[in-house]
A protein has these predicted regions:
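Walker B catalytic acidic pair
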Residues: 206
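Active-site-proximal or metal-binding-adjacent scaffold patches in catalytic folds
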Residues: 1-201, 210-259
Length: 259
């Protein structure tokens, strides 16, 4: 939580409240904002979290009444989210845009590897004990993402003659990539789930920011010069980007429990 949020939060104020609708209970995170003039609700599609923004002088009682009044809205939005796909045996996960079925092979050596059967079906195999399957798959995907993103970013940087200070790969929920004025590039590891042309476009986009830290026409010309098929990648992200956030989530829908 940021220091600004702590500044506006009252000492005894809860960080979240519960909203009941039909047979489900939803956990709603409270967030005060100094510029808020009214109570607002939103669903974070990436984290599957319900967030209620409050005015500085708003009360928890009013926030609870507001959220409960909109319980049907919350439930409807959750139903529209794609089903969670945990990293577990039998689940299909895309790797560079190609579906791979997770296969747990408890007795085998190694950690995670890919293979293709005689019918051309792709598998993402993981060894070890069942409790470690989720973490091992996640670690593997993050390593693959870093490898691809570093290779693509450094290739584009070489073409422009610019220097990357550092490359960070993490689970960013709000942006697929970013570039700081100090030359640090940050990316979401989930780009490894998308087709390779999407990852390549994001790498070109952020490297272009090392020259033009804006979204001016000159910036977009630079992106097109580095990656001529940028529009195709942008369209893919607009259509399918939200879906990438469902992988690796627990089977229970975020924020909702049956009562």
């Amino acid at each position: 939580m940021s220091w600004r949020a702590l500044l506006y939060r009252r000492p005894s104020e809860p960080q979240a409240i519960e909203v009941f609708f039909e047979r489900a209970v939803y956990l709603v995170r409270l967030r005060r904002h100094r510029q808020a003039r009214r109570y607002t609700l939103r669903i974070d599609a990436a984290s599957r979290e319900v967030v209620l923004t409050m005015p500085p002088r708003g009360s928890v009682r009013e926030a609870r009444d507001f959220a409960q009044k909109h319980g049907g809205w919350i439930a409807a939005r959750f139903k529209r989210l794609p089903e969670a796909a945990p990293f577990a045996h039998g689940i299909e996960v895309p790797l560079r845009g190609v579906a791979h079925r997770i296969v747990h092979r408890r007795g085998e050596r190694g950690t995670v590897w890919t293979e293709t059967d005689e019918r051309g079906n792709r598998r993402l195999c993981v060894a070890g004990e069942p409790p470690h399957v989720d973490r091992r798959i996640a670690d593997f995907l993050k390593r693959e993402a870093r490898r691809d993103l570093e290779a693509a970013s450094r290739s584009y940087a070489g073409r422009l003659g610019v220097k990357i200070t550092r490359i960070s790969v993490r689970d960013q929920s709000s942006r697929w990539g970013s570039c700081s004025n100090s030359g640090v590039l940050s990316f979401s590891w989930r780009l490894i789930l998308a087709p390779s042309f999407v990852l390549d476009y994001l790498a070109a986009h952020e490297v272009a920011h090392l020259v033009e830290l804006n979204h001016s026409p000159r910036f977009w010309r630079l992106v097109t010069r580095l990656y001529p098929d940028a529009r195709r990648a942008k369209v893919w992200l607009d259509r399918h980007g939200t879906d990438l956030h469902r992988y690796g989530l627990p089977e229970r829908r975020g924020g909702a429990d049956e009562v």
